[in-house]
Amino acid sequence: MKKSILTGMIAATLGLFNTANAEGMDPAALKTVYDITRNTAGLMSYCVDKGFLKAESIDNAKKMVAYVAAIPGGVDTRDGDKREAMGREGNVLNDDGKVVALEKEAPQGLQAWCQQADEGIRQGLTSIGQ
C-alpha cells in the first residue's frame, strides 16, 4: 500500500497534463486530479521547508494547479484548500482515504520523493509549454 500511494501521486502528476486535456473528462476524475494537484502543491511547500527543494518548486506546483483549475467544464475546487493544507503538513490521503504522513510512507525516502515529484511537475509543465 505504501508504494501505491506515492507511486500513484507521482504517476498522477506526470500524467496529469495529458489526461486533463481529454474532452468530456468525468467530473469526479477531474476533481480527483485537482485535489491531487492541490495536495502536491502543499507537499512542495513541505519539501522546500525541509530544505530538499527551492522555492521555484512551489511556483511550478501553483502553475500546475492553475492549469487544472482552468480546464473547461468547471472543476470542483471545494476541497482544494484542505488538500493543500494537508500537504503543507507533509500528509497525503492513502488508497483507503486515510491521512498518512509522507515522511513515513515514502519507500524511497522523503528527499528522493520530493525530487521525483518536483521533476514530474517540471516535465508536466514542459509538456504544456509552460
Feature map (PLM): residue ranges:
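Immediate post-signal-peptide N-terminus of mature secreted/exported proteins
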Residues: 22-58
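Generic alpha-helical structural signal
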Residues: 11, 33, 111-112
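Processing junctions and N-termini across compartments
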Residues: 16, 34, 41, 107-108
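Bacterial N-terminal signal peptides that target proteins for export
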Residues: 1-7
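Bacterial N-terminal signal peptides
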Residues: 7-16
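Generic anion/oxyanion-binding catalytic loop in active/binding sites
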Residues: 11, 29, 103
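Sec/Tat signal peptide C-region and signal peptidase I cleavage site
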Residues: 16-22
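Compact alpha-helical subdomains of small soluble proteins
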Residues: 56-130
